[in-house]
Amino acid sequence: MIDAPALDTAEFQAKLDTTDLGRNLLAHFSIPSTMDVAREVAADGAPHGTLVFAEEQTAGRGRRGRSFYSPASQNLYFTFVLRLPLAVHRRLPVILPLAVARAIREHGLDARIKWPNDIWIHDRKVC
């Protein structure tokens, strides 16, 4: 199995406008689940903001452990390791969809939020 992602990690990191999110980037072509890898590296002490990225997930999971179809090179599959105070964690389900929709709108697309955390563009769910 090839584990070299198409993502150019150096270019990706050069374009980041953050001090921590995505600065530690673990990019793979195919892994079972970005969430599982993120959990493992977090337990091993990965820093806040570590980004686990994959071109494909062979055992991806969505909410409540539901199977998540993750074909190669069709979508963005990633998980962040976040080391934040509990009070911030509780607000993330509200904050993140707002931030994602805003970022998409800044690129000229009409992103809509379907609560609690789905983002839709032109009647299609995009995340």
What do these predicted regions represent?
Residues 1-109, 126-127:
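N-terminal lobe of the biotin/lipoate ligase/transferase fold
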Residues 113-121:
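Glycine- and Gly-Pro-enriched alpha-helical subdomains that act as flexible
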